[in-house]
Every structure is written in structure tokens, then in C-alpha cells.
Amino acid sequence: KSDREVMAFCQSFMTELCKYIGADTDVPAGDIGTGAREIGYMFGQYKRIRGLYEGVLTGKGLTYGGSLARTEATGYGLLYLTEELLKLNGIELAGKTVAVSGSGNVAIYATEKAQQLGAKVVTVSDSTGWVYDPEGIDVAALKEIKEVNRARLTEYKKYRPNSEYHEGRGVWNVKVDIALPCATQNELHLEDAQALVANGCIAVCEGANMPTTLEATEYLQKNGVIFAPGKAANAGGVATSALEMS
């Protein structure tokens, strides 16, 4: 869709939504497919209709009330918690291989921070398929594909010829030390948990909201896998949104 089409949709959506939200009522934030651009269009329409400049949406741009590093906050926070959780168990994050699902804000910046901390992320995914890069995901290429070109991961192989693109699901079948589900709800099922355990995965930390099914969670915990639920693991974004609201 063109920017104009996206703007028209966001403005129409907010024309109705503004009746039900407010700084002291409900405060929406971005999620899958909704970033600073879309939040900006909606915030502009809210101001136009209500005549109020208040903390009614989070994830805005820095020039109109956003918080520094809000885009990175959820992914970065996930890795800070993962690193500390591993340390509590006498394990270093550096040198570990990591599977990440998704390729939105959470996944991109979780991948970036993981590699800054010395781990190697070898997978990312989107709604059509997933990429395996044994040399480690190229974050700059991933950002260009997803944030600039708004394209599919099928483009990744143009940047990294040695990588593999697979259609459908399959991220959790790769042999890794750590799994970070960062895509969507209920994406990691019991059979995925069984594959992770069989491949020697030592930790699963949730970047998305409730990405691991109850059966999968119970299986991971029963098999001694370190598990961090999203309520704690992805709270970096919420914490930074609170700063934006204030």
C-alpha cells in the first residue's frame, strides 16, 4: 500500500476509535504491522478531532512526543533479561546460537542486541516463511528489507547468498542453544517444544505476547529448559511506553 492509502486508513480508523480512548482511559500502542508511521497518522487524527495533545498513543516519533529507543526497547529488554537469567544459571550468553522468529521491531532489535552481546542469531521469519543464515543474520540487510523496502524475507538471499529461505514454519527445528519467539501469539506449539528439547535448547524467552502454548510451556519446564514468560521478558517496551505517557 502507498503511504497515502495507509494514512487514509489510519485516519478513518481513528475517527471512530477516538470515541473510546484517552490518556486516562485506554492507551493503544503499535504491534504487528503498526509502527511509528501508523501511530503518527492516528495521533495526528486524534489531535485534529479531539483538540488534545496528550499521551493517548505510544510508539510515536521523537518529534511529537515519542520516547528515545522506544522502537528498540522490547527487543533490547528481552536480551537484557535473557542474559541475566542465563547468568543466574551459570551460563554465558556470548558464544551461544539463537533462533529468533518474526522480523518486526521485536525480532529485529532482539537480533541486533543478541549479536552485540556475543551470541549468533541464525533465523528470522515472517508470515510467508523463514530464513536460516549459518553465518549469523545480517541485521543491516534485515532492516533494509523490512523497515525500508517493506518487503518479504525472500529478498534476504540477495544480500546473503549462503543463507537458506524456507516457506512455511520451521524455525524451531533448527539446532540452537536459545529460542526467542518474537512473532505472534501461540506460534510455538508442543511439537516445536519437543524439537527444541531434542536439539538441546537450554532457554526459551518470549519476545512476543504469549507466543508459547500452554502445552509447550509445560513441556519445556518439565524438561529443564529455562523459560521466561513474555510478561517479564518483553516488558522493556511497556516500561518505555510508560515514560512516553508521562
Functional labels for PLM-detected ranges:
Residues K1, L62, G66-Y76, A228-T240:
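Conserved phosphate/anionic-ligand binding catalytic regions in large, soluble enzymes, centered on
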Residues K1-L68:
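N-terminal ligand-binding/catalytic initiation module
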Residues M7-C18, I39-G44, Y76-E83, I108-Q115, ...:
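Predominant activation on well-ordered alpha-helical scaffold segments within soluble catalytic domains
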Residues G22-D24, I91-K96, V174-D177, L196-A203, ...:
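Short, surface-exposed connector motifs at secondary-structure boundaries
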Residues T25-G30, G51-L57, V100, T123-D126, ...:
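General beta-strand structural signal in soluble alpha/beta enzymes
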Residues G33-E38, D126-V131, A233-G236:
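Glycine-rich beta-alpha junction loops
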Residues T58-G61, G66-K175:
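Glycine-rich phosphate/diphosphate-binding loop of Rossmann-like nucleotide-binding domains
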Residues A183-S246:
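Rossmann-fold NAD(P)-binding glycine/threonine-rich loop
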